[in-house]
């Protein structure tokens, strides 16, 4: 799993501030989000398991997490699938591909930049 890159988003204890931590040793901070990227590090990345705890959605925490992912991988060709966050991913250059009327899942891609 050396090409699997986990990202944890933690709510900093006592501040309400979201931050990315590299370690699973969060101490008193509360994990409120998670994402995993599979990549070859050269041409392609696949975004999967992007989750923000429901009560923290719509407050900018997903943006914090996605900004970090795109900072590290945004120059690569990207792929993902989603059911309900199409507009969110479009802000990062992803676009729907295929016939989105025939499936619940929306497959999206982002060209290399």
Positions of PLM-derived features:
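Conserved active-site alpha-helix within GNAT-family acetyltransferase domains
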Residues: 75-110
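A conserved beta-strand-loop-helix scaffold within acyl/acetyltransferase catalytic domains
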Residues: 2-51
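Short coil/turn motifs at secondary-structure junctions
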Residues: 40-42, 55, 85
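Conserved acetyl-CoA pyrophosphate-binding loop and the N-cap/start of the following alpha-helix
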Residues: 55-65
């Amino acid at each position: 799993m050396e090409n699997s890159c986990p990202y944890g988003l933690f709510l900093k204890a006592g501040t309400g501030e979201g931050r990315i931590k590299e370690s699973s040793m969060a101490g008193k901070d509360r994990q409120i989000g998670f994402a995993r990227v599979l990549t070859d590090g050269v041409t392609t990345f696949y975004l999967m398991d992007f989750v923000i705890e429901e009560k923290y959605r719509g407050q900018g925490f997903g943006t914090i997490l996605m900004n970090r992912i795109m900072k590290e991988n945004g120059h690569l060709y990207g792929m993902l699938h989603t059911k309900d966050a199409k507009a969110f991913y479009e802000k990062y250059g992803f676009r729907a591909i295929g016939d989105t009327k025939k499936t619940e899942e929306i497959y999206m891609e982002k060209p290399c930049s």
